[in-house]
Amino acid sequence: MKLKELESCLQQVDGFEEPKILLEQYPTSPHIAGCMLYTIHNTFDDIQNKLVADLGCGCGVLSIGAAVLDAGLCVGFDIDEDALDIFRGNVEEFELPNIDVVQCDVCSIGSSYAKKFDTVIMNPPFGTKHNQGIDMQFLQTAISMATSAVYSLHKTSTRDHIQKKANDWKVKMEVIAELRYDLPASYKFHKKKSVDIQVDFIRFTPT
């Protein structure tokens, strides 16, 4: 499947109706989701026939993309029932048999799913405002769940901090791409229509 085809497919995925600020629910755009998944699939062969987890899956754009690219099974994990209702609606719309969903607090599931997945993909909360450090909790959980690789988005400004953590956790960290994440003005306190954030697309692998 070409990148453009994947992107236009992901444009059909319904997003958040009322994003929740406490959960830092910012949508992953079809463009960014498409670029991530296309690279994971074509460069690293970490989706097709693999067991894939999507942490903080929200309405499911990464999960659905992974399922469309023939993941053996993709399981989305999220705490928010409203987002998961939209996720389930999207799955029905796409008629995908290789996708499942679990409602849970992502930060508390690592031990239950230790090394149960080949690949973990995620666009975690950036850990700003109310949730300082949650990005690292997501990452630590993801690393504990994956046997092959974790793919994640993180603010470029936190790269040195993440590298230090990766060294502590004895995982290899590779910045695959630097992306501009267009953050839509989805909350009332956002003054501008949208804000560009520099984001690293990172691959973590066991050493």
From Swiss-Prot:
Q: Which UniProt keywords apply?
A: Cell projection, Methyltransferase, Nucleus, S-adenosyl-L-methionine, Synapse, Transferase
Give a yes or no for keyword Glycosyltransferase in this entry: no
Return the broad EC class: transferase
Residue numbers binding S-adenosyl-L-methionine: 25, 28, 56, 59, 61, 78, 105-106
Say what happens when this gene is deleted.
Microcephaly and curved tails.
Quick check: keyword Glycoprotein in the entry?
no
Q: Which domain of life is it from?
A: Eukaryota
User: Record's InterPro entries?
Assistant: DNA_methylase_N6_adenine_CS, rRNA_MeTrfase/Polyamine_Synth, SAM-dependent_MTases_sf, Small_mtfrase_dom
Activity regulation behaviour: rRNA N6-adenosine-methyltransferase activity is inhibited by zinc.
A GO biological-process term: rRNA methylation
Its localization reads: Nucleus; Presynapse; Postsynapse
* Molecular function in Gene Ontology: nucleic acid binding; rRNA (adenine-N6-)-methyltransferase activity; S-adenosyl-L-methionine binding
Identify the main location: nucleus
Report the catalytic activity: adenosine(1832) in 18S rRNA + S-adenosyl-L-methionine = N(6)-methyladenosine(1832) in 18S rRNA + S-adenosyl-L-homocysteine + H(+)
Assigned protein family:
Belongs to the methyltransferase superfamily. PrmA family.
What PANTHER family does the database record attribute to this sequence?
Answer: RRNA N6-ADENOSINE-METHYLTRANSFERASE METTL5
- Write the protein's name: rRNA N(6)-adenosine-methyltransferase METTL5
Origin species, per record, is Danio rerio (Zebrafish)
